[in-house]
């Protein structure tokens, strides 16, 4: 099969998958109590497996092998994709498929700590991806708007924008519970999680598959096999969806509180007149903030209630890191600093969002590390090819905020770090010589057509709170667009 034919087969498979997902999502949305009893055949459907394979192969982790040593490339070069998927489908249907343990890999995180990743085999990743294609549209119908992490069409900027919206005038939710869950992905209770999954999934074969992946075990870096009696391994394709299913218990609880997001404007106003608090939750995966229009005592009381809610899922709040903060003091959330300040030159106060100091330190450390890794024996062009994308990507994330001052400061620090690198490279050269060689007589390093990226020249924007208008990937418009691309229907004439 040539490339054009294989692309058309994949596009038609994606069209079929999208059509079925749209139906599943609509049925789940229209009937909140519906349990889906025949989903396994979709997991083993050739179209779902092909789309799942394509997503696994296109992921940057495709070159990383699990405990069986196989990669996506080795499968293509060996038995071939067609035979691989046929064999996998047969194993699923005759129930001989068994997930293998994930391979443990420890990666560094901030503060010198390590994060455990679980690397599944390519075969297991394909099955997990197919499971996600089937389950995600169903559970997305239940997830509330306050949840943003690992969800389609949603991003961290949406969560930050909502938090800014809620703490700004005229809403002014001023007290904030900054939530921190201890080892969230490692401690989720399997029975509690399966209970929540089972509210929507009645197919015992699908439930068995999900449970098998949870119980697959971990092959440690010391080659010791450990059981997994709790948690969802970070790094697995299913883990983000399952963690959202577990943490939706928190979303549902806050939504149902008197004064919560389901309360009407009139009800919230009446509660405030009687000195009662109102609440809103903003969550991105296991990072969450509960904002309260009330008093600190109201925030403290609700923190204890939330600890009880999370305990039903086997989770614990960190007493040291779960803080109660006033918006005047500010808080860090998803890399951003969110704080109320007086606007310069006026007596008015506004809530601003800008890069947190921790985020700034992180990118400056990245710049220093790259300058150490790219030795002075290499060219300035080699350094800029590594350095520019890192700084540009950081600035792109923080562009929608009040980040101009931070960008200007970062630009100066990047410039001085690169200049120190050039001075080490040419220890006997004068400033004048270096400027003539690398800056065309100016001060900003450039080699050929590549110049050092200047954060100070990045314009800032405002990312607006989208509220409940965030589009669904399973809308009729998205389905029609895919069908046109696959040649299954004619494009409308305008």
Positions of PLM-derived features:
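Non-catalytic terminal/accessory segments
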Residues: 1-494
């Amino acid at each position: 099969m040539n490339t054009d034919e294989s692309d058309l087969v994949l596009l038609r498979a994606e069209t079929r998958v999208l059509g079925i997902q749209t139906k599943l999502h609509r049925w789940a949305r229209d009937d909140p109590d519906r349990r889906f009893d025949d989903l396994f055949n979709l997991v083993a459907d050739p179209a779902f497996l092909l789309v799942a394979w394509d997503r696994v192969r296109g992921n940057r982790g495709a070159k990383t092998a699990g405990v069986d040593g196989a990669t996506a490339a080795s499968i293509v070069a060996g038995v071939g994709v067609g035979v691989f998927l046929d064999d996998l489908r047969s194993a699923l249907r005759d129930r001989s498929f068994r997930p293998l343990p994930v391979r443990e890999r420890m990666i560094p995180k901030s503060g010198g700590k390590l994060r455990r990743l679980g690397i599944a085999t390519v075969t297991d990743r394909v099955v997990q991806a197919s499971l996600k294609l089937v389950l995600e549209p169903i559970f997305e119908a239940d997830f509330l708007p306050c949840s943003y992490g690992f969800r389609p069409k949603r991003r961290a900027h949406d969560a930050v924008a909502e938090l800014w919206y809620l703490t700004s005038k005229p809403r002014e939710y001023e007290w904030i519970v900054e939530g921190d869950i201890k080892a969230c992905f490692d401690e989720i209770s399997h029975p509690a999680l399966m209970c929540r999954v089972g509210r929507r999934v009645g197919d015992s074969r699908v439930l068995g598959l999900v449970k098998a992946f949870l119980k697959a075990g971990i092959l440690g870096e010391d080659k010791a096999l450990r059981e997994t009696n709790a948690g969802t391994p970070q790094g697995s394709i299913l883990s983000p969806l399952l963690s959202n299913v577990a943490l939706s218990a928190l979303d549902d609880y806050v939504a149902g509180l008197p004064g919560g997001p389901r309360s009407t404007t009139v009800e919230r106003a009446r509660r405030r007149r009687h000195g009662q608090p109102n609440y809103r939750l903003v969550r991105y995966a296991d990072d969450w903030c509960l904002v309260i229009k009330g008093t600190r005592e109201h925030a403290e009381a609700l923190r204890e209630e939330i600890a009880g809610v999370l305990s039903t899922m086997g989770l614990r709040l960190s007493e040291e890191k779960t803080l109660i903060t006033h918006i005047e003091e500010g808080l860090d959330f998803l890399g951003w600093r969110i704080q109320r300040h007086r606007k310069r030159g006026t007596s008015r106060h506004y809530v601003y969002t800008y890069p947190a100091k921790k985020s700034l330190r992180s990118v400056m450390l990245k710049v220093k590390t790259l300058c150490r890794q790219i030795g002075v024996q290499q060219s300035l062009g080699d350094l800029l090819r590594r350095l520019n994308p890192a700084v540009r990507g950081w600035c792109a994330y923080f562009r929608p905020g009040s980040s101009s001052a931070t960008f200007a400061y970062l630009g100066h620090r990047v410039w001085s770090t690169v200049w120190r690198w050039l001075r080490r490279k040419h220890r006997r050269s004068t400033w004048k010589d270096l400027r003539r060689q690398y800056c065309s007589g100016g001060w900003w390093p450039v080699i050929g057509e590549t110049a050092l990226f200047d954060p100070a020249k990045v314009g800032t924007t405002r990312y607006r709170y989208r509220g409940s208008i965030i589009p669904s990937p399973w809308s009729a418009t998205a389905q029609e667009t895919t069908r046109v691309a696959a040649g299954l229907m004619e494009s409308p004439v305008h």
